């Protein structure tokens, strides 16, 4: 389901264009300077002023009482689900979501939770689908304790949940006594693409986090926000998981820098993604949906190459893309320019043309 070509391979030409993921960004010189200047302290006892400033800023951005700094988005999902649920509980989430399929089965390995996978197009499910999956408290069945959504959807194509849909789902969940958790790995992309504030997107959701190591361009870091009580519970799990940190302000400074400099420019990544998808659609044998944000999923069903052969052929020409959820994915980010998109399209066109020529050659030999 997931395939990533070798980025560092001495036998291959160096990577010129990295469309593997928005996690591939290099911290800029200015970001590194902000990191070097940051006042720091012991995060574990709440004494890192830069981490505290970041948490206060993100709590306010998302309209929540409190927030906590984490090393990654994955640990935000893990600590949040551990804080919301107890062993034997059920989590309802879209069948393609990160918590279901890309976290090493944490829910079972660490929590003893059951996943109730929900269907729906583009990584989203409707309030009706959720309603149909809910049951009354019943000693024969798992206690349903949490509903999760992903903003934007990753395997769903980087689509943006509308606030009305999010509101319907949160209202239905809380009317049935379930907590609500939003995986906001790319929530800032959703906000920029839809011109809806992060606070509005997060409104009505019990816990929400944003990732700084994706499109925002920081080397690491995510911030999870919620009520004071919830964040207290999360701190207990952060400690238990070995996630409490020391002079983490060095990294929090990069996140603060990202909030100041790298949010509005996400619109450039979205424009580049649209340009890439439009170019792909003009190549015979390739189909791509117009992206809402920075993830471009595409198919080469009319090309003889398998997805993996295609990814390797691109890599051999210095362009990195990946396979995710069984589909080809190219991702734009702050180290990708419009000129690189044009060049990547040229490489794709060449790979497809070589493939077509080889097939015609084979047929001619028969
Ligand atoms: C990347 C991602 C995560 C995990 O975040 P990391 O910072 O890589 O641990 C979780 N959910 C979604 C939707 C993601 O895309």
Question: Where is each model-derived feature located?
Answer:
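Conserved PLP-enzyme active-site core in the AAT-like
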Residues: 2-336, 344-366
């Amino acid at each position: 389901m997931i395939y990533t070509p070798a980025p560092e391979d001495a036998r291959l030409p160096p990577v010129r264009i990295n469309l593997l993921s928005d996690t591939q960004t290099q911290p800029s010189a200015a970001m590194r300077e902000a990191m070097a200047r940051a006042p720091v302290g012991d995060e574990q006892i709440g004494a890192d002023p830069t981490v505290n400033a970041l948490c206060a800023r993100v709590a306010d951005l998302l309209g929540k009482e409190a927030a906590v700094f984490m090393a990654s988005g994955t640990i935000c999902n893990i600590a949040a689900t551990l804080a919301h649920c107890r062993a034997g509980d059920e989590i309802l989430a879209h069948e393609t979501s990160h918590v279901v399929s890309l976290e090493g089965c944490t829910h079972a390995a660490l929590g003893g939770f059951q996943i109730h996978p929900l269907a729906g197009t583009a990584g989203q499910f409707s309030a009706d689908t959720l309603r149909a999956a809910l049951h009354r408290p019943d000693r024969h069945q798992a206690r349903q304790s949490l509903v999760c959504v992903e903003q934007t959807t990753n395997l769903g194509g980087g689509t943006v949940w509308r606030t009305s849909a999010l509101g319907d789902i949160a209202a239905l969940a809380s009317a049935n006594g379930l907590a609500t958790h939003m995986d906001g790995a790319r929530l800032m992309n959703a906000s920029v693409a839809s011109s809806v504030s992060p606070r509005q997107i997060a409104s009505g959701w019990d816990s929400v986090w944003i990732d700084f190591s994706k499109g925002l361009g920081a080397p690491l870091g995510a911030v999870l926000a919620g009520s004071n009580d919830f964040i207290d519970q999360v701190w207990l799990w952060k400690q238990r998981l070995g996630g409490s940190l020391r002079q983490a302000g060095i990294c929090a400074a990069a996140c603060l820098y990202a909030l100041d400099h790298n949010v509005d420019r996400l619109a450039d990544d979205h424009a580049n993604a649209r340009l890439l998808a439009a170019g792909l659609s003009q190549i015979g044998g390739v189909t791509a949906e117009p992206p809402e944000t920075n993830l471009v999923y595409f198919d080469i069903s009319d090309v003889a190459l398998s997805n993996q052969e295609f990814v390797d052929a691109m890599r051999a020409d210095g362009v990195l893309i990946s396979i995710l959820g069984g589909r080809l994915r190219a991702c734009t980010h702050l180290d990708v320019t419009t000129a690189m998109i044009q060049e990547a399209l040229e490489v794709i066109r060449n790979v497809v043309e070589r493939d077509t020529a080889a097939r015609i050659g084979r047929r001619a030999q028969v």
